[in-house]
Amino acid sequence: MLFLLFLLITPIYAGLIFLTKPSNDPFYNPPKGFEKAAVGDILQSRETPKSITGRFAPLEIQNSWQLLVRSEDSFGNPNAIVTTVIQPFNADPSKVASYQVFEDSAKGDCAPSYALQFGSDLSTLATQAETFLLAPLLEQGYYVVSPDYEGPKSTFTIGKQSGQAVLNSIRAALKSGKITNIKDDAKVVMWGYSGGSLASGWAAALQPSYAPELGGNLLGAALGGFVTNITATAQAADGTVFAGIVANALGGVANEYPEFKSILQSDTDKKSVFDEFDSHCLADGVIDYINTSFLTGDNKIFKTGWDILKSSTIAKIVKDNGLVYQKQLVPKIPIFVYHGSIDQIVPIVNVKKTYQNWCEGGISSLEFAEDGTNGHLTETVVGAPAALTWIIDRFNGKQTVSGCQHDKRLSNFQYPNISSSILKYFKVALDTMMSNGLGSDIQKDKITPDDLRKFLLGGW
């Protein structure tokens, strides 16, 4: 009942709460001379202006901060990103989970640092819903760090920008002890699903060369709905109910590569199309572009269609930002991949190719949990307890698989030793609805098995 009441009043109440958007917030602007700072340095910090919450899951936590962090774009040009640090009750300062949300937008005002706060636009609904994945991490007593990995230009799908931002966010978190109490030798696990897996995967692959000093901190990365080929995802989504992802991706690439934008603009009669591509978050983008064909069919917006990939400029951009093509980049940390066999948005074939590349490259530990009955959307939920099990095992010092291991199950709910994590996952979701505090060993309203049963069966 509390949850239903929350759903009813939140849109009204949130409309009365003024939360400055990143485009109008001076905090997002780096100070003069920031270029001289080292990547990962904290340029400025503050407590989050509003509480961390999802429209469906208000988070009762100890504290939260925003750090403005020195980073750089795909070409090595200095920039600054904001990362959000969330502290649960009774937090363990030696354990940090870097969670990369699936922002999937080319619009700066959709950034996680904004979307995760109370009072953010309804258009950021997808990010707000991801608090269900953040909450179980907080419940374990882990600090959660969530970076605006797309950077100030909102470069959705761009690999180096995203991966470097994740690593620089972690660097900053480990330097933030005087602000957050996180230890500089804290252990860190990365996690991301879909668009968040793109950023997390690139971070894992770049870490040995870009941030070798983090090798002693990083325990591994969990990658779900793993995006390794942005073209394959665009081809799968174009002309479908998920065509908005294509629009947002085109906008994100154009934000990093002006030449990409010029080539596509010359291939359409709709010259203002790119003005629209960077004006949506994920949720409203999907709604506004349902069944739109950008590069497919007779009524496509871009005349050349998929033959546009024959342009050497376009082909290079696509290859540079597809992790599946980067055989030379092999993670040195343990990796857990979970993916649905029938994923219709992120085809599993490219995940298998990346798995093969990394195995042939000598990766020390790569576990691939293939779910035989779930697609992209359902695996978000079904695969989460498996990822949580794997993450908890990493922090508890349990042994990872040696070498490469690919297991296909009917469902990832059948992942080994997952039962307690399934209970934790859904119990914490219920905790958030009841506004119970999140953290290790804290007093809460008692949740009975009957409460959990009602929640799972939709009886609330």
From Swiss-Prot:
Any one Pfam family match given in the protein's UniProt record, by short name:
LIP
The record's Gene Ontology cellular component field reads: extracellular region
- Keywords attached to this entry: Disulfide bond, Glycoprotein, Hydrolase, Lipid degradation, Lipid metabolism, Secreted, Signal, Virulence
Please list the residues annotated as glycosylated. Answer: N229, N291, N417
- Which EC numbers does the record give? 3.1.1.3
Return the Gene3D superfamilies for the record. 1.10.260.130, alpha/beta hydrolase
User: So which residues are the signal peptide here?
Assistant: 1-14
- UniProt cross-references to SUPFAM superfamilies, sorted A to Z: alpha/beta-Hydrolases
Write out the annotated subcellular location.
Answer: Secreted
Induction and repression of expression: Expression is induced in medium containing Tween 40 as the sole source of carbon. Expression is up-regulated during the yeast-to-hyphal transition. Expressed during experimental infection of mice. Expressed in host cecum and infected mucosal tissues (stomach, hard palate, esophagus and tongue). Expressed at all stages of mucosal and systemic infection.
Which residues constitute the catalytic centre?
S194, D343, H376
- Subcellular location, principal: secreted
Q: Where are the disulfide bridges?
A: C110-C281, C359-C404
At the top level, the lineage of the source is Eukaryota
Q: Summarize what gene deletion causes.
A: Results in reduced growth in lipid-containing media. Leads to significant less virulence in a murine intravenous infection model.
Reactions performed catalytically? a triacylglycerol + H2O = a diacylglycerol + a fatty acid + H(+)
MF terms from GO for this chain are: lipase activity; triacylglycerol lipase activity
Task: Return the InterPro entries for the record.
Answer: AB_hydrolase_fold, Lipase_secreted
UniProt-listed GO biological process terms: lipid catabolic process
Q: What does this protein do?
A: Secreted lipase that is able to hydrolyze both the neutral triacylglycerols and the monopalmitate ester Tween 40, allowing the use of hydrolyzed products as carbon sources. Acts as an important virulence factor in mouse infection models. Has broad lipolytic activity, which may be important for colonization and subsequent infection, therefore contributing to the persistence and virulence in human tissue.
Could you say which protein family the record assigns here?
Belongs to the AB hydrolase superfamily. Lipase family. Class Lip subfamily.
Mind telling me what this protein is named? Lipase 8
Organism from which the protein derives: Candida albicans (strain SC5314 / ATCC MYA-2876) (Yeast)
This protein's gene is called LIP8
